[in-house]
Amino acid sequence: PPNALMLCGVSIVDPDSTYVDDTVEVGPDTVIHANSHLCGQTRIGEECTIGPNSILVDTVVGDRCQVFASVLEQAVLEDDVSIGPFGHLRKGAHLATGVHLGNFGEVKNSYLGPGVKMGHFSYIGDAEIGAETNIGAGTITCNFDVKGRKNRTRIGKRAYIGSGTMLVAPVEVGDGAVTGAGSVVTRSVPARTVAYGVPARVHGTVEQG
């Protein structure tokens, strides 16, 4: 299969260390680096860079995406998404156009809207995140309660989630809202307000600074 892809305009840097199932589709002008595994019903668009050291299983990737040293399972990437190094997308992860997921970020059963930035050390599970929101380092959605139930987190557009924020689901953060570093959010945060503390409380609006 690597040789067949190369005949279709795909660049494979090291065919001997690249593993591609017969069922995989890859668009022209995509580059696949060494030690990459493309498995199952994976479909990759045009002008992407995959690897090195990446595993994609049953994953759909749009055009001009970058996946570096990461594992993607049953996920969807729209166009111009960048992941890695050491990112992990699990079943049901959907990253919209222009999303960036950096090192040691994990997403499961969640939608990240266009332009969302999630730079480092975060877990987003069972969540919906609006466009252009920034997820600070160490942010965690606490989605699994003591009764074994999975609960959802909803974050609006252009919100700013401070580093080390714990979002105890079910909870909602409104459009343009801000959470301070180290906050434990147990109650919903209204749009364009600032919340911080343990537990987090609203201390004013964004306009008030």
Language-model regions, residue ranges each:
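Extended, small-residue-rich solenoid/repeat segments and analogous flexible loops
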Residues: 1-69, 77-85
